[in-house]
Amino acid sequence: MTKILLLGLGRWGANHLRNLNNLPVELFVAEVGDKQLEPARKLGLSAQRLTTNYKNFIGKVDGVVIVTPAQTHFPLCKEFLEAGKDVFVEKPLTLANEESKVLAEIAAKHKRILQVGHILRFDPATLWLRDAVQNGEFGRVNMIRGHFGGFKRPRNDSGVMFADGIHFVDLFNFILGALPKSVTAIHHDFFGRGMDDVSFVSLEYDTPRGKTWATVETEYFIPGKFREVIICGDKLSAVCDYNVAQYKIKTYANTHTPAGGKDFKANEGVVTQIETPPEEPLLAELRAFIDSIKTRATPRADAQSGYDAVRVLNAALESVKTGRAVELK
């Protein structure tokens, strides 16, 4: 049985614990303090599988799931990869471009799995959208809009763009099968913490079917919970609500046709509700990580995708500082 170390039992780490406990793995858990290990004890994990010093278990496990603050990702991933362990790390892979690049290189050198927690890649709705876009059902995708926000407690290890905006940045890269050529962003720091709590990111993609303009809005203030993506093509459009378990997607066969001169006619088409399997994405991505450990297959959310997302976000930070569009290097 595959031996997995879960490193971190914070808010999101507790969800990893619940899902890993339901998978066919021998689970070990590490946290900085004994009190933080209580959720693992309540699930029945023995004292021999719990520690406040993760180094005690490095030699005992096949892989590690790292759910710790973003600033710790680089040193922890590096340590485990160089120790010959496969690694799943929550997004972002790192906060700095160079660190993400180094981790990808270390994973390749040591022939280790490095999977990044880009969870939306494992949502059945995402796979439907990607396939429909790639198969041409939308025609030319003119624009994509994403809003990942709502009133909640802010994270303190990064701004809202790195905490939440990264979900839709990676999602758009995945759906379009491309990276943006140009990035523009505006941030606000209403809390005065020295990090963004409102973020607007504009991305310009070149795809085989033409240019696509995408926007990602994230914040901590608007009442409610928003996980919405809208894709507008010249043949088909779709609204996807990631808050919904099964019926996330509605498609609209809306088109515009020339009506002479500068006039266009707006044609409202059939609205279709798309049903996708009600699979929990976190469980799916953890299962995929365990499968990759066994088969050595490249993960769907591999080190390169993690590096690419970090590059886009750092281009956005540069745009915020300079007030200009930044070409992705």
Question: Where do the model's predicted regions map?
Answer:
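Beta-loop-alpha module in the N-terminal Rossmann-like domain of NAD(P)-dependent dehydrogenases
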Residues: 39, 48-106
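A short helix->loop->beta-strand "cap" motif at the edges of active sites that frequently abuts
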Residues: 83-85, 110-112, 209-212
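C-terminal helix-rich "cap/oligomerization" subdomain common to oxidoreductases
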Residues: 43, 56, 63-66, 112, ...
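N-terminal Rossmann-like dinucleotide-binding module
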Residues: 1-45
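Contiguous beta-strand/loop segments that form the cofactor/metal-binding neighborhood of enzyme cores
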Residues: 163-248, 283-295
